Amino acid sequence: MRPSEGISVSDAIRSRRSHRHYLPDPIPTHTLDRVLELTLEAPSAWNYQGRSIVVVSDPDVRAGLEAATGGQPHPREAPVVLVFLAEMDAWRRDNHDVFHSARRSGAWSEQFIAGSAESSRTFQQDLLERGLEREYAVKDAVIAASFAMLAATEQGLACSPMNGWDETQVKKVVGVDDRTDIAVALLLPLGFAAEERRHPGRRPVSSSVHYQHYRTTLTDTSGRIS
């Protein structure tokens, strides 16, 4: 797979596969920069952008990620691994740059900015009291990772979202083992595919899409209810 810039979103979604093996070829800097730029266009709660990406290309650091994933080949073979981190304290920090950018572009009014600042504090405090702050932050980081997968596919790169790893080890490898306010959301190896992966198929829409209410019965491929 090589750069295919200009493909449609639909084509990127349908052609993306999860690759376990990669060529040793480095990713051109401009290609990686493009993927990162598009990734950071992902939406986030209150636009606080409480997610960070650690770009890991050093072989020794990737070896640490390989160990943290139980010896899976992706982090070792891929020239780059993106580690998506969720920042649970994003709402507590100074977000005036976010407000300034939205004000300057005309996206947010002064009234909306004032309301958002107050509402976000109340909302996040409620999450904290219910023990949901981590879960909420991880969602934002995973949304960004989804954007990264599509951006990588558009640029002709292969990738594979990884959710099987030891978080304590991953945090130590990327230097945040002392940060209780940061959680690991996802690992995403990137590179040029060394294998062809065929589409394994998906269940029909009728078995996964529900209207108005969730139903416990499933429709098989023949249309029968089971």
Language-model region placement:
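Acidic, surface-exposed loops and disordered segments
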Residues: 1-226
